[in-house]
UniProtKB/Swiss-Prot annotation:
Localization annotation: Cell inner membrane
Name of the protein described by the UniProt record: C4-dicarboxylate transport protein
Any single biological process term in GO: L-aspartate transmembrane transport
HAMAP family reported for this sequence: C4_dicarb_transport (MF_01300)
Molecular-function GO term, any one: succinate transmembrane transporter activity
PANTHER family in alphabetical order: AEROBIC C4-DICARBOXYLATE TRANSPORT PROTEIN, PROTON/GLUTAMATE-ASPARTATE SYMPORTER
Transmembrane segments: 20-37, 52-74, 87-109, 151-173, 194-216, 226-248, 340-362, 366-385
KW Cytoplasm (keyword) present: no
Keyword Transport: yes
Length: 461
């Protein structure tokens, strides 16, 4: 009996076996190699590229299986539209808030003031390729690109929105044929588990990819290259941190979970993004963790992939902050009307950045091209440091989409609180701590973890 109990007791995993420890160690090692042996570091770029390609290889099938089985399993097809509508509402509100926060911080800290750059002295050729690409990305062309030429082509290109489009239509079609579609659902369900197992296997190569990517970045660009524009970089990182902790922290609290606990829960994915500068690298792992923590697969399958195109909080902060930096650096005065126009244009242009290499910089070019007040040539000022801000953009986007998934699941009553308690005990500890601090600071009873500020009703058991 005792022997059986001992056999059932799981052994404690050594700290060095945890993926986040391995990735963090690899990042530090990559920085050191790139700093002390820059030529060697620059030559290690293929390691990071290879890992991103490995992960990109499985993104399309993971999305297809998750979305299709999730929608096909819905008894009420109206729920698909309801979930999608709530997700788009959330994306619109918080993407706009991210743009507004970027504007506010740029006006207060003024990171570009005092540079007195003459736009005529800048080389417009340095950003010509980005501007050309941006001009080709209109709202109509973006919507047309969602529809693939062929089903196979969408998977071959790895276009997230096209795969999502096919998955939604196929899932609805399976649900419409009723019982005759159940063999297909069972087959796809059987494929889902080994696909997520493959994801876990590929994640074991994350430390190698992070090491190569960080060694290349530090070896090629160097730390000294940050000095002249460190104010902009620091302002962007600070703004992203404040947005996550204050704005997203508030909406998390209103929906019964802690943003700090969430960050701890997805730390492996955050470190992976930090090492590779690609939020897509963490997409399969994020989808798996959101489902494990209690979100229904149907919600996860709709919200996470869609959020990667429509809920880019980090990119939105970057766009307005960088736009005002360029205006301040070139002594270009912007009235309140100009800044409102910038905000409105950015709201539209930010929705067309999915599937584009260098999406943040290209989207910035698209925004400035439509706002005559800010010189597009001024983008040459930040071209060299854009790479150093990509990590913060990607991490903020990742956290924003994780919170969006939990919030929409809570609004729909599709968040299993019992499962969350078991799978995510850290959330209970942080929430209780926050409630105690709230009582001490405010002098009245703090909301419990079941509080819902958005009228979605009590949390589901």
């Amino acid at each position: 009996m005792i022997a059986n109990q001992a056999a059932e007791t799981p052994r404690k995993v050594p700290f060095y076996r945890h993926l986040y420890v391995q990735v963090l160690t690899a990042i530090v090692a990559g920085i050191m190699v790139g700093n002390f042996y820059p030529d060697l570091g620059a030559s290690l770029k293929p390691l990071g590229d290879a890992f991103i390609k490995l992960v990109s290889m499985i993104i399309a099938p993971v999305i297809f299986l998750t979305v299709t089985t999730g929608i096909a399993g819905m008894a009420d097809l109206k729920k698909v539209g309801r979930v999608a509508g709530k997700a788009i509402l959330y994306f619109t509100v918080f993407s706009t808030l991210a743009l507004a926060v970027g504007l506010l911080v740029a006006n207060i800290l003024r990171p570009g003031a005092g540079m007195h750059i003459n736009p005529a002295t800048l080389d417009p050729k340095a950003v010509a390729a980005y501007a050309t690409n941006a001009h080709g990305t209109t709202a109509v062309s973006f919507l047309m690109k969602i529809i693939p030429n062929t089903i196979v082509g969408a998977f071959a290109d790895g276009n997230i929105l096209q795969v999502l489009f096919i998955s939604i239509l196929f899932g609805i079609s399976i649900a419409m044929v009723g019982d005759r579609g159940q063999p297909v659902v069972r087959f796809l369900d059987a494929l889902t588990e080994p696909m997520f197992k493959l994801t876990a296997v590929l994640m074991k190569a994350a430390p190698i990819g992070a090491f190569g990517a960080m060694a290349f970045t530090n070896g090629k660009y160097g730390i000294a290259s940050l000095i002249n524009l460190v104010m902009l970089i620091g302002t962007f990182y600070l703004t992203s941190l404040l947005f996550v902790l204050v704005v997203l922290g508030a909406v998390a609290r209103c929906n019964g979970f802690s943003v700090i606990a969430l960050i701890a829960y997805i730390k492996e994915e955050i470190l992976l993004v930090l090492g590779t500068s690609s939020s897509e690298a963490a997409l399969p792992g994020l989808m798996a963790k959101m489902e494990q923590v209690g979100c229904k697969r149907s919600v996860v399958g709709l919200v996470v992939p869609t959020g990667y195109s429509f809920n880019l909080d980090g990119t939105n902060i970057y766009m307005t902050l960088a736009s005002l930096f360029i205006a301040q650096a070139t002594d270009t005065p912007l009235t309140l009307a100009d800044q409102i126009l910038l905000l409105l244009v950015a709201m539209l242009s930010s929705k067309g950045s999915a599937g584009i290499t260098g999406a943040g910089f290209i989207t910035l070019a698209a925004t400035l091209s439509a706002v005559p007040s800010v010189p597009v040539a001024g983008m040459a000022l930040i071209l060299g440091i854009d790479r150093f801000m990509s990590e913060s953009r990607a991490i903020t986007n990742l956290i924003g989409n994780a919170i969006a998934t939990l919030v929409v699941a809570n609004w729909e009553g599709d968040l299993d609180r019992g499962r969350m308690t078991v799978r995510w005990p850290g959330n209970q500890r942080w929430t209780k701590f926050n409630n105690k601090m709230f009582k001490l600071e405010r002098g009245f009873r703090a909301p419990t973890v079941d509080v819902d500020c958005f009228g979605a009703g009590p949390a589901q058991p």
